[in-house]
């Protein structure tokens, strides 16, 4: 039976995409006010900066660094990077963190898992510092028994090493752990390849209607469905 649940963080425990767009726009307002740069110029420079960073750094935690994105954005705009990059970074994450909330039903599930002595892990791509800040903002300090970031693991999902590090920290075998994540390839198939059970958390919206789970992969669209599914996998239910 299941003894631990490992969650992906972004877009699994809360709505990352919506906050990312809103935080990006918030930085855009700052750039337009301070530098007189148009929305289109800012957007184009940011896209170039993000792509260049990812191409340079590959599949690493640092490739997600907003500090690097904003520094390069200014460089592409022919502006000295020290002039505004730190303020852009702080504006982005300030807005982001101030507006974070768990998905409906997530808190109830976490409490139910705690009552059944089911351990909870979080396994996430990105830098440890900002993921710690997110989890604190979500009020999960007392919920998480194990945290693994790709910065710590040295690899990103779906590499088996990041999942194996979670198992080492939990001191459990792969068969005793279920992974819950929103990305079918990185989270779900990566976890399955590492020997874990897995559930695809897949809220249905206009951008995801065409994606389908393959045969044998459990999929849920909200936390009520996830609660009901996990209840059948945990001794004594939830």
Pin down the residues of each PLM region:
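Asp-based, Mg2+/Mn2+-dependent phosphohydrolase catalytic module
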Residues: 1-5, 18, 40, 107, ...
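N-terminal helical cap/lid subdomain that shapes the substrate entry/recognition surface
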Residues: 2-104
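A short, Lys/Arg-enriched amphipathic alpha-helix followed by its capping loop at the start of a domain
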Residues: 26, 30, 34, 109-118
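Residue-level marker of alpha-helix boundaries and capping positions
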Residues: 61, 100, 122, 178-179
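Long, charge-rich low-complexity segments
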Residues: 76, 117-120
């Amino acid at each position: 039976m299941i003894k631990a649940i490992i969650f992906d963080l972004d877009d699994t425990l809360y709505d990352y995409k919506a906050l990312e767009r809103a935080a990006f726009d918030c930085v855009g307002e700052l750039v337009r006010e301070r530098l007189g740069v148009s929305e289109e110029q800012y957007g184009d420079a940011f896209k170039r900066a993000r792509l260049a960073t990812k191409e340079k750094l590959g599949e690493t935690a640092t490739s997600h660094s907003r500090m690097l994105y904003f520094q390069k954005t200014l460089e592409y705009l022919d502006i000295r990077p020290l002039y505004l990059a730190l303020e852009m970074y702080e504006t982005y994450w300030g807005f982001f963190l101030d507006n974070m909330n768990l998905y409906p039903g997530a808190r109830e599930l976490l409490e139910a898992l705690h009552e059944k002595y089911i351990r909870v892990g979080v396994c996430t791509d990105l830098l440890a510092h900002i993921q710690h800040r997110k989890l604190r903002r979500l009020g999960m300090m007392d919920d998480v028994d194990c945290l693994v970031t790709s910065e710590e693991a040295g690899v990103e999902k779906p590499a088996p090493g990041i999942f194996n590090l979670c198992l080492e920290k939990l001191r459990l075998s792969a068969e005793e752990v279920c992974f819950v994540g929103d990305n079918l390839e990185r989270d779900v198939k990566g976890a399955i390849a590492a020997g874990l059970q897995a559930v695809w958390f897949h809220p249905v919206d206009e951008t995801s209607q065409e994606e389908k789970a393959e045969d044998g992969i459990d999929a849920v669209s909200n936390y009520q469905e996830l609660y009901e599914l996990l209840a059948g996998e945990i001794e004594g239910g939830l």
